Amino acid sequence: MRSLVVALTVARTLAAASVFASDQGVEPESGAPFSVTAGGRAVAVQEISTPVVWLKGRDAQPYWYAQFDSSSPVEVRVKARAGVDRLQVLPKKAAIRTTRTGDDEVAFTLAPSCQVVVEPNGRHRALVIAANLPETDVPDAKDPNVVFVQPGRHRRNLKLASNQTLYLAPGAVLEGSVCGAGTNITIRGRGAISGLCWGHYKGPGGRMVHPGGFVHPGGHVVHLEGSQITVRDIMIVGAWSWCLVLDKTDRVLVDNVKILGGHVINDDGIDICRSSDVTIRNSFIRAQDDTIAPKWWCENLLVEKCILWTDAANAFRVGYECLPENGRGFRNLVFRDIDVLHLSLHKNKPETFWANCAIFIQPSNATAFENLLFDDIRFDSVERGDIFLNIKTQSIVGTLTRSKEAGRLRGCTLRNIHIANPFDAETMRVHLEAADAAHPIEGVVFDDVTGYGRVSAVRTSAPSPRPHRQ
């Protein structure tokens, strides 16, 4: 197989340094409302464009992103045109202490590898900063199994096969879709895959197949099928539909991926479809739509040490599109040690069909849901009317399903979750609604969970609480 190098730039090894930019070859935004330095060196700040579909008015705001590599903790300085009087750095778990160094500047220390969000004035017009460890394993651009994308912008679609690696060099921006099918496929690097050039469902290709057989020609930004798949360190910026789709996969690792969505609705962060033995960790995911969404069926999933942010949907959405192939279902799903920065701007009631929740579990299509665990989930911002947990066994009829029968749930534990809820009982509600006695919700346990609002249960029992541990 002949090697493919996108752009005729010769690969080079970066000189050893304590701090260096991860965005070489990318011009900084001239009108950015932030400037950033790390270890005294300027870091380019990139705009993630204003949403073009769904969010409107004051909610349709751009945000910005900066990243750098460092081998050790480093001082970061941020100048914010909006001022720093109300500035906060999230997630709160990071316990970032800022020092004011000027009228519009703060300094703080970041250790690799981590991601934080700087908010001068709330959730709108924020700055995402990622501190990465330096790359030590840049592949050989001449390797016939490596698709090497050099710094700069490149508009094309790519298809990957077994034993291939797509490497996005620092400063590389691939505008298009990436599809891969096979065994031992890797996507990595410090560059980006961008969907910002296309409107809602107007993408250049890929696959978008629903259980009912519906295929959307726009496709996904990244669609992967197969076994032994790794996606790490890259950015996915903007999307015309779903961002990263793992479809019919097993033995998958997604690590230190930054999904910078919000361009359109239906831009799900990571969809895990018909897949097993998948690990997602150390990643930042912002989307207008659902951020983590197991679909069709999903077994043996671990999502840990991630940061989630949804603008108009659900942080976790499990199910809705369900397909119990060969007895498969949603089993052994673990979500732990996760920071949820913000929930949907669009508030509604959990009884509504398109409810927007922190956790929405929807067994449908005669599919079994068993052994789900949400452990150590932290909510940095709670707004009036947010919904904490919504579980519905329901019948869904349309192009997405093959059955009118609802699903069922047996075993869902929520553990070590403490919500700072300054509002009334209608905020961070819990709602359980079974379709009927044949499609029950069973074994929902709250273990050391505090701060949630009113609990409502329809044709089922309320969650079984375990005492708060002091």
PLM features per residue range, with description:
Residues 17-470:
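Extracellular/periplasmic carbohydrate-active domains that bind, remodel
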Residues 5-15:
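Bacterial N-terminal signal peptides
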Residues 1-2:
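Classical eukaryotic N-terminal signal peptides for Sec-dependent ER targeting/secretion
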